[in-house]
Design a protein with these regions (language model features):
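Aromatic- and Gly/Pro-rich donor/ligand-binding loops
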Residues: 1-132
Length: 132
């Protein structure tokens, strides 16, 4: 089976977008993944591969094409609503406005998936003094 393609915007250096290829393989290490960057010149076509649409405002008219598309925490914006077909499985979107834009029940509105990066950050050291 071919690797799951991680779809994200990589035209401008934006932390939220650029953590996609770092974060998703850590969250789901049992799944073989590789980057499928979004380019400024148009729609990305993953062909017969499955695509994970994750962190960022990626739900728009430039939505990728692929065999099966999995949406986890993405937001709607930057133009027209995406063309969602039967091959799209939405687990959650970034918030209530994204859910409403896609005519989804409010229960699909979660939070920006970027908050998951916190699972892999070291714990902050305890503070012993007021200024340390």
């Amino acid at each position: 089976m071919s690797p799951l393609q991680i779809y994200y915007w990589d035209v401008h250096n934006n932390f939220g977008d650029l953590i996609n290829p770092w974060l998703w393989p850590k969250l789901m290490p049992e799944i073989d993944m590789e980057p499928l960057p979004k380019k400024e010149d148009g729609i990305v076509d993953a062909g017969d591969k499955d695509v994970l649409v994750g962190i960022g405002t990626l739900l728009n008219a430039r939505f990728p094409k692929g065999r099966k598309l999995y949406v986890m925490g993405s937001g709607v914006g930057y133009g027209e609503r995406p063309p969602l077909g039967d091959n799209t499985k939405i687990y959650c979107v970034r918030g209530p406005l994204s859910a409403k834009a896609l005519d989804l029940p409010e229960s699909y509105a979660a939070i920006d998936a970027g908050v998951l990066v916190n699972r892999f950050l070291p714990e902050a050291p305890s503070v012993k003094y007021k200024f340390s």
